[in-house]
């Protein structure tokens, strides 16, 4: 069986794992609803640029990890 948590591939999955693996916790820390996080997941797992600093702050992950399409790692 494949463990998807250890192989987070989308920026959203990486952010969720960084806060303990909970979409609800990530939503609370970022200041959005759990439904908003679920919508991001359904749309491919990219994070909104408008909340870039907030995602960096709450996850402790650098923008190069959270926004690989914008910043080269």
From Swiss-Prot:
CDD domains: HTH_XRE
GO MF annotations, alphabetized: DNA binding
Ranges of the DNA-binding region feature: 23-42
Listed PROSITE patterns: HTH_CROC1
Coiled-coil annotated spans: none
Pfam family, one: HTH_3
The keyword Transcription regulation is assigned to this record: yes
Record has Transcription regulation as a keyword: yes
InterPro entries according to UniProt: Cro/C1-type_HTH (IPR001387), Lambda_DNA-bd_dom_sf (IPR010982)
Alphabetized UniProt keyword annotations: DNA-binding, Early protein, Repressor, Transcription, Transcription regulation
Gene3D superfamilies (alphabetical): lambda repressor-like DNA-binding domains (1.10.260.40)
Domain HTH cro/C1-type span(s) in chain numbering: 12-66
Protein name: Gene 30 protein
Organism: Enterobacteria phage phi80
